[in-house]
């Protein structure tokens, strides 16, 4: 990916790309449930988190994320690792996620529409189920 392509993708995410996973499994008035399953070297593009959410690693692995503020973070996960995030009014986080390990890396992410300080971002797709 060129720097120009990365910048265009980042700008789109900042504007409101709410696709926080690869597959939207379910959506109700209260939650959105997503999955991510990345082969080594695969990447989920920049996306924007505005809702309170949590993710759980369903396979162990290692990732690299680039953030809109310029930070770069590498993280190792054990199966079952879970992390929670909370956002206040107008707060958000924009990042990408790349599998830099040598095995598949998978997550389930649950966005909490009910109880979040921000409205959910609109999506251009419907849940698979």
PLM ranges: what are they?
Residues 49-71:
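Glycine- and acidic-residue-biased ligand/ion/polar-headgroup-sensing regions
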Residues 1-35, 43, 65-67, 71-94, ...:
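A short, N-terminal "cap"/entry segment at the start of jelly-roll beta-barrel domains
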Residues 32-37, 44-49, 53-56:
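A generic structured-segment signal
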């Amino acid at each position: 990916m060129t720097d120009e392509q990365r910048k265009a993708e980042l700008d789109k995410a900042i504007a409101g790309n709410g696709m926080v996973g690869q597959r939207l499994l379910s959506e109700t008035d209260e939650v959105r449930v997503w999955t991510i399953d990345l082969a080594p070297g695969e990447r989920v593009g920049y996306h924007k988190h505005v809702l309170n959410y949590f993710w759980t690693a369903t396979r162990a692995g290692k990732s690299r994320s680039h953030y809109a503020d310029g930070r770069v973070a590498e993280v190792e996960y054990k199966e079952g690792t879970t992390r929670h995030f909370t956002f206040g009014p107008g707060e958000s986080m924009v990042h990408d996620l790349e599998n830099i390990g040598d095995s598949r890396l998978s997550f389930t992410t649950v966005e909490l529409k009910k109880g979040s300080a921000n409205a959910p971002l609109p999506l251009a797709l419907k849940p698979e189920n």
